[in-house]
């Protein structure tokens, strides 16, 4: 019996226990079949994160024989609804000789896989984005400490409908400066005044103002 590389190399994410205990988390049910999708580009994962999928673990390894049945088996074990797999052919093949002295080439792949569950609690938010502190390269690029970078825009959210994009930098909500620590406080303060707010953003170095109607 061949070992399952997806099981042997699987690691739960650091926040798995929080995800597991969250009543909003939707795990794979006993009668369900997990979806297995193959990505060409690692950036494509954001398309699925924006639909409310969240990672619970991953398995990364090199193999010449990993099968789809094996990834399905591991997905069922950890109750993942979706697995995103990226395969990259390694530059060199390995020459093997069988008992009859015939040479065969074995092609090996670098395989990266992410196991995900669903959580639609993001629809309870008023804006529908995930933001964080400006990374060092943006702090240096824009010569500023304040502001937040948009890591994710949920599909069909108020931010999505207003055409806010991933990697935009939000500098103000209405006339108030924002940064990671005060962003939610300012957003909630301004929402109490009106569901219509103006976001000042930096996109590719250009200042823009985007009107957003808060709430789903």
Regions flagged by a language model, labelled:
Residues 83-85, 159-182:
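Conserved PDZ fold ligand-binding element
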Residues 53-94, 164-166:
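Short, well-ordered alpha-helical segments
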Residues 110-148, 152, 213:
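PDZ/PDZ-like peptide-tail recognition elements
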Residues 54-56, 79-80, 108, 124-126, ...:
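Extracytoplasmic
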């Amino acid at each position: 019996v061949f070992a399952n590389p997806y099981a042997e190399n699987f690691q739960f994410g650091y926040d798995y226990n929080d995800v597991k205990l969250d009543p909003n988390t939707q795990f794979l049910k006993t009668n369900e079949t997990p979806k297995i999708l193959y990505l060409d580009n690692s950036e494509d994962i954001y398309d699925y994160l924006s639909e409310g999928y969240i990672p619970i673990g991953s398995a990364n390894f090199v193999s010449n024989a990993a099968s789809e049945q094996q990834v399905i088996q591991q997905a069922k074990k950890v109750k993942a609804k979706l697995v995103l797999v990226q395969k990259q052919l390694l530059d060199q093949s390995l020459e093997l000789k069988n008992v009859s002295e015939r040479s065969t080439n074995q092609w090996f792949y670098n395989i990266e896989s992410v196991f995900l569950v669903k959580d639609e609690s993001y629809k309870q938010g008023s804006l529908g984005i995930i933001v964080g502190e400006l990374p060092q390269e943006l702090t240096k690029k824009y010569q500023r400490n304040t502001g937040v970078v948009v890591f994710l825009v949920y599909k069909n959210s108020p931010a999505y409908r207003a055409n806010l994009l991933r990697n935009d930098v939000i500098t103000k909500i209405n006339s108030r400066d924002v940064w990671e620590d005060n962003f939610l406080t300012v957003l909630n303060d301004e929402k109490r005044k009106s569901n219509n707010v103006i976001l000042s953003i930096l996109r590719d170095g250009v200042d823009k103002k985007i009107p957003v109607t808060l709430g789903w």
